[in-house]
Amino acid sequence: MNADPVLSYNFDAIEYSVRQEIHTTAARFNAALQELRSQIAPLQQLWTREAAAAYHAEQLKWHQAASALNEILIDLGNAVRHGADDVAHADRRAAGAWAR
């Protein structure tokens, strides 16, 4: 008679991996934005007053959007942490039900 397969998870490892991927994604995103800023910086010196003002208005929108995305990534990382805690707790409760 074959034993039933056991389904098990390492909740800490799953949480760590997902949160690490979120952190890596945020770092790549912010590095790309910084690279873009450094490439645009020399051009800004050549722009007329109107062009500079137009760029500044758009750059402010980009900055706000980037900040919002970074906040979303932070919230996502926190949700992953809390979700992993919730799943681990549910698993312990389920295991406890069999111990009765």
UniProtKB/Swiss-Prot annotation:
It holds the Pfam family WXG100. This is ESAT-6-like protein EsxT. Keywords: Secreted, Virulence. Transmembrane segments: none annotated. Disulfide bonds: none annotated. SUPFAM superfamilies: EsxAB dimer-like (SSF140453). The keyword Secreted applies. It comes from the Bacteria. The keyword Secreted applies. Belongs to the WXG100 family. ESAT-6 subfamily. GO terms for cellular component: extracellular region. Induces apoptosis of host cells via activation of NF-kappa-B. NCBIfam families: WXG100_ESAT6. Forms a tight 1:1 complex with EsxU. Complex formation results in induction of alpha-helical conformation and stability against chemical denaturation. InterPro entries: ESAT-6-like_sf, T7SS_ESAT-6-like.
